[in-house]
């Protein structure tokens, strides 16, 4: 289900009514048709099989089966018992799930932001179900080495649209990076922001933050340069610029194995843009990755940039000769070109 600001989320509670004698965390074991596969009713049990021949324990949570972990011990692949639909389930302590999901509850639905479909409350855990995904942007760009401008424009517009919606709704995302965006379809043409768990809810128009939150390669100069406050929205925009550059070039604009050297490069704000990119793409990158926060485009202004309305069939013919020889990141200098991005 979609989460709307004016509509309370529907919470399914199992084992709370007088007609229920068992909580879903205490359900009896369900046996599959094959004797070698057993199902455990306890959330703590799910784990990937050590070998294909060993039994694989899963959990029955309401009308869902929780299968193997996808990330750590709190994110699981889930399957709807009746429809067979595949989802993702995140597990939170019951005492803090509302705080963790507060940004989701205060933001209206958007096509490029992952939506909660259902929440089930147990005695000690909250099970939050999301639509499944088809990989993340980081892995996709790593596989492709870099993207052609037409594809990058289509995907980056969706990314910027999600960020602009969050900013308009009073959220600062703080930890923006390619890995945070996942694909909605197998064709990998539509993306969405994976979660809002790291977002900060603003109390009014002031977007000043003081925490040092984010991935080193995506952090903005002002976060490194000041011990005071900075504009959270402008810092998000800087991270968008790093994402766009990486999508088009195949590596971070600022990269170094040593963190101190990396931060020095970010503070200076100097980077090189390959000549293979079109003038409009270069313009957008430079308009975002400006050292002075007040000079950067806003997330909404990014969406209005003429690069997105480019006739790429004409643009490709003008710059195609250069792109053919520079489409993939070369294998030489692997440490320089790949490690800063693929870590």
Swiss-Prot record:
It holds the Pfam family Pkinase. GO terms for cellular component: cytoplasm; cytoskeleton; nucleus. Highly expressed in peripheral blood leukocytes. Residues 29-45 have a biased composition (Polar residues). Residues 61-308 form the Protein kinase domain. GO terms for molecular function: mitogen-activated protein kinase kinase binding; protein kinase inhibitor activity; RNA polymerase II-specific DNA-binding transcription factor binding; ubiquitin protein ligase binding; ubiquitin-protein transferase regulator activity. Belongs to the protein kinase superfamily. CAMK Ser/Thr protein kinase family. Tribbles subfamily. Interacts with MAPK kinases and regulates activation of MAP kinases. Does not display kinase activity. Interacts with COP1. This is Tribbles homolog 2. It comes from Homo sapiens. The lineage of its organism: Eukaryota, Metazoa, Chordata, Craniata, Vertebrata. The gene is TRIB2.
């Amino acid at each position: 289900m979609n989460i709307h600001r004016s509509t309370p989320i529907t919470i399914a509670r199992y084992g709370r009514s007088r007609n229920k004698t068992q909580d879903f965390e205490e359900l009896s074991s369900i046996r599959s048709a094959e004797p070698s596969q057993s199902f455990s009713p306890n959330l703590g049990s799910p784990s990937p099989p050590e070998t294909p021949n060993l039994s694989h324990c899963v959990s029955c949570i309401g009308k869902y089966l929780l299968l193997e972990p996808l990330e750590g011990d709190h994110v699981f692949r889930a399957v709807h018992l009746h429809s067979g639909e595949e989802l993702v389930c995140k597990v939170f302590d019951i005492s803090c799930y509302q705080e963790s999901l507060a940004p989701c509850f205060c933001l209206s639905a958007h096509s490029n932001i992952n939506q909660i479909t259902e929440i089930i409350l147990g005695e000690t855990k909250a099970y939050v179900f999301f639509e499944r995904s088809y990989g993340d942007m980081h892995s996709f760009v790593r596989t492709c080495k870099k993207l052609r401008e037409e594809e990058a424009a289509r995907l980056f517009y969706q990314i910027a649209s999600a960020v602009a919606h969050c900013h308009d709704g009073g959220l600062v995302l703080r930890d923006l990076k390619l890995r945070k965006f996942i694909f909605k379809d197998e064709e990998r043409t539509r993306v969405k922001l994976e979660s809002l768990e790291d977002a900060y809810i603003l109390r009014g128009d002031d977007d000043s933050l003081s925490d040092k939150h984010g991935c080193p390669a995506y952090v903005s100069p002002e976060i490194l340069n000041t011990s005071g406050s900075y504009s959270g929205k402008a810092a998000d925009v800087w991270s968008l610029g790093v994402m766009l550059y990486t999508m088009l070039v195949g590596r971070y604009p600022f990269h170094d194995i040593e963190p101190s050297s990396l931060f020095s490069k970010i503070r200076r704000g100097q980077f090189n843009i390959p000549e293979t990119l079109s003038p409009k793409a270069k313009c957008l990158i430079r308009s975002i990755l400006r050292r002075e926060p007040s000079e950067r485009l806003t997330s909404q202004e990014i969406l209005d940039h003429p690069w997105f309305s480019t006739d790429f069939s004409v643009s490709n013919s003008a710059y195609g000769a250069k792109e053919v020889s520079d489409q993939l990141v070369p294998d030489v200098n692997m440490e320089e070109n790949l490690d800063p991005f693929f870590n």
